[in-house]
Amino acid sequence: EFDTVYHEHLSFFNINSMEKACLMNDMVLTNVTKTDIHGTSYVFDIALFKHETDANIDDLKDCENSLYDINTYDEYSLNCIKYRNELHNALIEQKLSGKKLIGFGSTAKSNTLLNSMNISSDFFTCIIDENKLKQGKYTPGTDILVCSLDDISQEDVQDSIFVILAWNFYEEIKNKLKERFDNCIVMNIYPLFIE
């Protein structure tokens, strides 16, 4: 999920760092819950007094041990490059088959991803975003027009594929598009599939 590594998202508290922060402030970490937000995030339960800690903390900490091994980051880098190339090839394949690409979600993560692939404005017809402040503007670095869903007609959809760049909202966006447009084709970028 290299597309979520940018400016304010570069910092992430893992369990070890949260435990240290708690100790420095006379608190104790009592439980950790994993959530699916942005791939995976943690929700920490913290107490002011000594409490029993949940057994899952040790299990999750064991999973974090690889974070202190440089090979983990080398492998991560190779996986990012591999994924980026697979996605880029899938987009090129759609273009070569005659499909127009319409993106959905002009987010920081989508712009990080598109810039990493050197995508330009001739690749996408536009990128839909529901934020009115973004509509009529262009994506940074790639110069792709950001438009409203209302700018897309049923006729536009006939030879197009919607590329869901805001992959963490895939189901919601897909359902919205399928309700609005007959026979629309939707591509999820993470994981990569078309339906």
What are these regions (language model features)?
Residues E1-S11, I15-S17, C22:
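Short, glycine-/aromatic-enriched active-site segment of Class I SAM-dependent methyltransferases
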Residues K20-L23, I46, I194-E195:
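Extracellular glycan-modifying ectodomains
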Residues M24-V28, Q94:
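A structural motif corresponding to the C-terminal end of an alpha-helix
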Residues M27-H38:
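Conserved S-adenosyl-L-methionine
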Residues G39-F44:
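Short hydrophobic/aromatic beta-strand or adjacent loop that forms the aromatic wall/cage
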Residues L48-E195:
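Hydrophobic, well-ordered beta-alpha structural blocks that scaffold small-molecule cofactor pockets
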